[in-house]
Amino acid sequence: DRIAGEGEVASDGWSIAFPESGTSNTINWDNLNVLNAAAQSDIQNGLVDPRIEHLLAILTQKYTLDISSLRSDHSMMTASGNVSNHYYGRAMDIAVVNGVSCTDMSSTSPCSEVGRLLTLLPDGVKPTELIYGYDLDGSGPAFALADHRNHIHAGFGPA
C-alpha cells in the first residue's frame, strides 16, 4: 500500500564551488593551519596526492582547518597492520574545524558538519576512506573507529 500525504519539498543549494583539481594554489591558506613542519613540507614539495589537495581547496573555502597529519608525520602502518594511505600521501587527519576540536562529536559540531559534507561529495572527489568517532553516513564509505574520536581521517586508495 502507498502512503499519501501533503508536504513541501525543500532544497538546499550547494554552498561550495569545486575548484580546479591539481594545484595547492587553490587552497585558501588563510583557512589552513598545518600543525607541523613535516606536513607543511609535504604540501609544498608535492608529496600529497592531488585528491587530498583538492579536498583541502574545497574545504578551506568555507572552513578553517587544523590538519594534524599528512604523509611524513604519520607511521607507515595502521593500528590494524595495513600500510596507511598517509604513507603514500593519500590521506589527511583533520583535528580542528573553525576552532572547535574534533573531540566534539555532537551532531551540530563543525567537525560533524565537515564529515557529513565529505560523504556528500561526488564520486571521484569523495574520499574512499572516511573515519571518525562515529559512522557519518551509514552504508557509505565512512565508518567509526575508537582511535579516531579526536580527528576526521579522509583518504583515498590508489588512483
Predicted regions and their residues:
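Residue-level detector of functional hotspots within protein domains
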Residues: 51-53, 78-80, 138-140
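Active-site-adjacent substructure of cysteine-protease-like catalytic cores
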Residues: 58-90
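Catalytic cores and adjacent binding grooves of peptidoglycan-active enzymes
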Residues: 2-26, 42-45, 66, 83, ...
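Helical scaffold of the NTase/Pol beta-like nucleotidyltransferase catalytic core
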Residues: 29-65
